[in-house]
């Protein structure tokens, strides 16, 4: 989606519900031509359409909403060529009324994001149309929160989710941390979830306005699920597993402004490490600079800009200072390598409104077509957490990567240590801490299984009965070595992350490689062997391996199925 940032500067007299921009040079009064695909629609005007024309417009809006996974952007007063012609005040009012009626026909809502004057009496407007898909309770986006220890991640999530500022000594994070040792140290060591909702008007729905997670979900048209990941180096494997296993849509990288100003090597190294993870997994990310009430963010921004513009990154930093920057960042981030940078304080609340506005307009990263395709596939649920609750039984938490699971669905779980799978039945489903009857592809959930199964572990999968249930000890992958101090040869052992799988594996064969072995930036096909037990791996899965300073990425190209002996 292209927007107006490059065309004008923000004005100084905004109306009540939207932003207004002053006139700009005629040379700049143009957007790129209207895209044929996607969720952006240009309309010169929508005044007094005939009944037939209105039905056509509704059909067109329905298609744009489908393309945008429930969200569409209408540029009113703009020709198909991208020229900003503009409308009179009366025509704009009439066009917005028509757009409201179109949205109402589909059960959608509209909100004016911004307006701009292009001539003395002509204006253009950018309007967000949002409709929760019929088979969904709300539009959902998962955001993984990364950052070094003491960067303020949990404190920031506590402020966002509970609506109360921090007292400067970590009071806000007490609502987020899960374990006693976390409360004592103030450091996250496990993966936790927090939610933040938005209603149709863009107002925040959090625990300050709702008592339970279920109420937040019921009152929200859009729900942000935060994945709070550990920042300390000794928990890095847990952090990588969370990123790889939960498949988040976006990453929010939190950086402490004081740490950069005092050049803390641990903080800076972990910031770069986490940024490399997001880049390796091809996840769009934004950066939040915290603790600006203690230290100004100028030096931090300069350092971040130099890192983002470096050869290994090649991103375009955009410091967010206004609502205009927010809208532009959300629209250009996926396609133009833009990385938004927010400077906030969890104590004073400085610029928190800009961050929440960004989360409100943040688009889902998967198209409706791709989601529908995944839902048609046979079920595959990746298990990331296992709980045994007295009088209830076994509960597994994770992400449904494909298919649909209902209550009473019959599945198989595995692989066990001998490579076999065991039949199970789903008794109940919980999502966002509330019961539900169905979970669909890309959604995270907790499933209560019918019976207890010995030997369950993280990294297992639940599969539909129509899937080939073959585990493996050996698999082949095409890998790229991102960094290694010396050379990699046969026998090299590393921790491999494939989806929710985390296990030590050894390289037993390297193809297309001479006696020198593999070095930094080298690429080759290799065969891995798992060290402990078989795993469920399929061709095309992305992998990430690391051992100490060694890092690499790759794609699984072939799987050698384990032969299970009957009986």
Model-identified regions with their sequence ranges:
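Alpha-helical scaffold elements adjacent to nucleotide-binding pockets in ATP/GTP-utilizing enzyme cores
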Residues: 98, 155-160, 192-194, 235-238, ...
């Amino acid at each position: 989606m292209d927007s107006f940032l490059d065309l004008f500067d923000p004005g100084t007299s905004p109306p009540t519900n939207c932003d207004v921009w002053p006139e700009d040079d005629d040379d700049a009064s143009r957007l790129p031509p209207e895209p044929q695909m996607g969720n952006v629609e240009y309309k010169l005007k929508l005044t007094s359409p005939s009944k037939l024309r209105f039905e056509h417009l509704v059909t067109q809006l329905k298609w744009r909403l489908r393309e945008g996974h429930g969200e569409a952007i209408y540029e009113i007063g703009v020709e198909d060529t991208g020229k900003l012609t503009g409308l009179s005040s009366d025509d704009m009012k009439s066009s917005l009324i028509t757009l409201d009626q179109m949205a109402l026909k589909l059960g959608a809502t509209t909100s004016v994001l911004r307006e701009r004057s292009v001539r003395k009496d002509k204006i253009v407007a950018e309007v967000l149309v949002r409709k929760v898909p019929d088979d969904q309770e709300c539009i959902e986006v998962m955001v993984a929160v990364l950052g070094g220890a003491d960067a303020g991640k949990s404190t920031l999530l506590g402020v966002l989710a509970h609506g109360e500022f921090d007292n400067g000594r970590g009071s806000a994070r007490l609502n987020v941390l899960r374990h006693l040792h976390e409360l004592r140290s103030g450091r996250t060591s496990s993966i936790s979830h927090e939610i933040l909702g938005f209603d149709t008007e863009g107002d925040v729905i959090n625990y300050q306005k709702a008592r339970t997670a279920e109420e937040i979900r019921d009152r929200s048209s859009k729900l942000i699920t935060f994945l709070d990941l550990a920042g300390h180096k000794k928990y890095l494997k847990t952090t990588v597993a969370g990123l790889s296993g939960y498949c988040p849509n976006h990453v929010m990288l939190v950086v402490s402004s004081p740490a950069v100003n005092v050049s803390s090597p641990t903080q800076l190294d972990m910031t770069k490490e986490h940024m490399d993870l997001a880049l390796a997994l091809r996840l769009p990310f934004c950066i939040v600079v915290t603790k600006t009430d203690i230290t100004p963010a100028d030096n931090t921004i300069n350092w971040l800009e130099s890192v983002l513009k470096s050869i290994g990154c090649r991103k375009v930093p955009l410091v967010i200072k206004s609502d205009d920057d927010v809208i532009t960042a959300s629209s250009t981030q996926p396609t133009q390598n833009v990385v938004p940078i927010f400077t906030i304080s969890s104590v004073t609340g400085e610029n928190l409104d800009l961050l929440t506005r960004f989360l409100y307009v943040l688009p889902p990263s998967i198209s409706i077509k791709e989601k529908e395709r995944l839902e048609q596939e046979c079920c595959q649920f990746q298990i990331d957490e296992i709980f045994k609750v007295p009088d209830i039984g076994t509960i597994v938490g994770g992400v449904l990567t494909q298919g649909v699971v209902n209550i009473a669905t019959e599945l198989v779980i595995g692989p066990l240590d001998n490579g076999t799978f065991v039949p199970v039945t789903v008794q109940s489903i919980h999502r966002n801490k509330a019961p539900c009857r169905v979970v669909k592809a890309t959604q995270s959930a907790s499933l209560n299984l019918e019976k207890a199964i010995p030997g369950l572990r993280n990294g297992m999968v639940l599969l539909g009965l129509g899937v080939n249930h073959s585990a493996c000890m050996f698999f082949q992958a095409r890998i790229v070595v991102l960094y290694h101090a010396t050379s990699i040869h046969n026998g090299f052992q590393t921790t491999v992350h494939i989806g929710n799988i985390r296990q030590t594996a050894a390289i037993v064969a390297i193809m297309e490689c001479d006696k020198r072995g593999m070095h930094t930036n080298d690429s080759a096909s290799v065969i891995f062997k798992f060290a402990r037990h078989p795993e469920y791996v399929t061709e095309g899965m992305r992998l990430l391996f690391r051992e100490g300073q060694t890092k690499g990425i790759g794609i699984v190209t072939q799987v050698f199925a384990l032969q299970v002996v009957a009986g």
